[in-house]
Amino acid sequence: MMVRLSPLMEQYSRIKQQCPDALLLFRVGDFYETFGEDAITTSRTLNITLTSRQKDDEGNRIPLAGIPYHSLDVYLSRLVNAGHKVAICEQVEDPKQAKGIVRREITRIVTPGTVIEPALLQERSNNYLAAVLLENGLAGLSLLDLSTGDFIASEVPVERLGSELARFSPAECLAPPGVSLEGMKFQNLDAELFSLNEASESGGILGDLHKRSPLCARAACAILSYLRETRIQSVDHIKPIRMISSSEYMLLDEITLRNLEIFRNLRDGSRSGTLMEILDETVTPMGSRTLARWLQMPSMSLEVIRRRQDAIEEMVRRAVIREEISELLDGLSDLERIIGRVSLGNAGPKDLVALRSSLRRIPEIAHAMSALESEYLVEIRKRLDASELDDLVVLLERALSDDPPTSPRDGGVIRDGYSPELDEIRSALRNGRSWIAELESSERKRTGIKSLKVGYNNVFGYYIEVTKPNLSMVPDDYIRKQTLSNAERFVTRELKEVESRVLSAQERSSALEYEVFLDLRGQVASRTRSVQEVAAAIGELDTILGLTRAALMGAMVRPVVDAGREVILRDSRHPVLDRVMKGGFVPNDLTMDESSWFMILTGPNMAGKSTFMRQVALIAIMAQIGSFVPASYAKIGLIDRIFTRVGARDDLVSGRSTFMVEMSELANILVSATKDSLILLDEIGRGTSTFDGLSIAWAVSEYIHSRIKAKTIFATHYHQLTQLNLPGIVNYSMAVKEEGRSITFLRTVVPGATNKSYGIHVARLAGVPEHVIRRAEELLDIIEEQAAIEIRKCRSKERPKRYTQLIFFNQPESIDNDILEEIKNLEPEKITPLQALNLLVEYRRRLGCKDAKDTHT
């Protein structure tokens, strides 16, 4: 038999059809309830009880799971972090006024990229919603942080899209169907949403982006369309989109960000032990996010770098002013995100109180900066002089009570004296409550019942309670309403009249106060741009102060940054390890100039080669964000990109071996690097046979030297590379102190090569059994002797080249032109591995190789 759904479930079903791909949180009284498959998913994700409601139209029980409305943010955070899209359906009319079922509507659809609630956001990180569009080998990328209003765009070659996404780490990425990128999950949108139709409705947010980059403009339009789909009603706080150019910033790809542990460590993915953690001495959320943006995009502008350095240098000198400003900044609320919530209509009374409290300090901060002279700090001070915000503080002082409740509907939000109409209603309400409060005393006197009490509950309203022993003294005008085990409850006609006036006044007061609050919030929203400008200035000021504190804590110096190609470091230290080791880190020097720009670095495992390379890269990044650096002297020519090939890592999901991953990363470096780049290579070629690896390492070194000419540090155990005799290539090694069978790593980089790796010593330190160690030492002597013989043979077969260096492969004096032509015309992707092997054997036979055999099958 068909079971008819209840009106509530019919309403739920209609609303659920509007968002079939989202979990629907359906407000019912004091709970948000989920039904059906949504309930099963919600119960499993949140680990809450799964129950059931009435039967569906097929007679099956409907699964039900609910959460308390006051705990929404906590549970919403867990659902969104688990990757779910969540639709919030609210009761949009007062149940008391409803005729029939309460009207409900979806008010928000929350996704990872559209969250604005503080509980769902990381305070010190941006939360970007990205959109990507690919065409003709180019990628248009737009990113919006809805919580702050930051809107940026970048057009890059498709092959650089992964690095660009890694740089900004968006919480959610939109793309048309068919777009895919390894390691990135896309939210597919209809291709028609990636059109410029939205541009005319964007209120000037996109500016002339459609002329500068149609791809980015269409991606930005997709974001704005998506906001409408997720029920975002206002875009007034979104800042005009800013196009970023790769020529303005040092490029740091995904691999470099990971290997250098800029934002997340390699151990557990947290910020512990990262460059961001060490430099982040900011005291406000705006400052921390500003620092993160500087690290994401180190500047290529000498002017920008100089201005920041000047500001830090002045703050280092001005200790008293520095501490005064720091105290004023400490405890400031997140102005950027508060004004975002105000503009979006989500801010509550507590947000406005926090805004008021923070804006009060701005004039004090500006005054404390009045004696500062550096160009950047003077500019920041001017940006803090916003008289319009003085008026806003006065408004909030007049309108808001000192300690309002969280919800604007709970009363006590608006201060007496702000709204005459509200004051009048409150006066009537107070008079009524005062009469009721005095009723108990007057009725005790009138009746002589000393235990008489006046009380209130939600069912009967106000009542007079008389204990049973005193019932004989109850006057005739008392009307019995309720009988208890030891008392009776009564009302009087006058009490009910006053109660009616009180409750009516209370309802009118609550409704009017809510309207007044909404009007106040609207007035605050009209100052959004001014608050955003002040918040940005505070973020930059806090970042300068944070970098100043980091410089003082780490005994850092101001680097010389210029347009040259030199990198000169004296007593340089790894910024993270130096802080952790508290002065125990061994400093090192580095000179890279026209005569020594390619360093071959040899030395044992665990001696510090990788650490040294990383510290050079980190110092370069610090220098180009305008920071001081850990050294006694530093001179750094602008670096356009940093490339790192460090450590072993496989990619099992894609079926790529460690060596394949290494070669892919190496290929990217060789294709993308320029003469102004910094390349750090660690153990290239170790994932294959010794001679294959050595050949690759040698060829790579030649290619970088002759073609790219980038500043390079190449750490290797292939000691043969130290024989590269080319201009600009220099040999350095990690110093070791040998005493008998034991060695001590001195962690110092010294001129000259070493021909020992001390791998067996490291094996002994690791606890490898002694008999294995002894056998390894015997074999090492044999293998090294054989290798020396092979190298001597190779040296006698050098080809006539402009290089005077070691050659490992004997070139035939002439190559068969027919074979060469056949190789040129080969299409490798169309032949099988077996066919390739047969071709290789055939070519060797035709070239007259003695060991060539016919293996055709």
Swiss-Prot record:
One of its GO terms (biological process) is mismatch repair. SMART domains: MUTSac, MUTSd. PROSITE patterns: DNA_MISMATCH_REPAIR_2. ATP binds at G603, P604, N605, M606, A607, G608, K609, S610. Keywords: ATP-binding, DNA damage, DNA repair, DNA-binding, Nucleotide-binding. Belongs to the DNA mismatch repair MutS family. HAMAP family: MutS. This is DNA mismatch repair protein MutS. It comes from Methanothrix thermoacetophila (strain DSM 6194 / JCM 14653 / NBRC 101360 / PT) (Methanosaeta thermophila).
